[in-house]
Amino acid sequence: SDDEQVYFHVNTHLTVELAKMAASRGVKRFIYLSSTKVFGDPVPPVVCFNSGSPTNPTDVYGESKLQAELELTAIAKETGLEVVIIRPPLVYGQGVKGNMAMLSKLVRSNLPLPFRAISTNRRSMVSLENLIDLVRHCLSNPDAIGQIFLVSDDHDLSTFEIICLFKRYLGSKSIVFSVPKYILYAIGCITGSTSKINRLVESSVVDIEHTKTTLNWSPPQSVEEAFKNMVK
């Protein structure tokens, strides 16, 4: 499809061409922002990915990112270019899109929200500031060479906790009440939003212990500070 061609052109082909150009011009290190989408969707009971988890992308975005990783690794062997791969989960900050933007909009509306029951799921995310800080560390740390790093805020949140943070920093008067999860799933089926509802209800966690240990790094920005900055 056209979409598939665009994903592979942008995420794979252009990335590989840029890396080849960098190597030919004497650039020493190449940091590639991949995605946890290379793991595919979490399948309960396994909802936590770590540095040793097998890759199994389930959409063209994840496939194109993984293909770029493989080709960059080959370029590193051929040219000596120091390649570092970072796999972030959802990245959030000002201008965030997707489900985070939707939740923010709902909370701003001050309408009652049926998400209180989604309080036991866990979602790993990373603020833009924490991601940038990790990239800075990877630029200079010799232990980063040839590594694949997962990144997050190291503070996983439930959907209910995310809504509470939005409420706090937006000054929202929305009441959050409980609706059984099966009703939310049914709404997703009826409205054709199954994947969006799944992302709201299910867990998806990344373990960043390898990143923290290898680079002696921890996320400098707290989740509270990140949310406060996001809704300014």
Q: Where do the protein language model's features map onto the residues?
A:
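Substrate-positioning beta->alpha
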Residues: V96-M102, R116-S140, G146-Q147
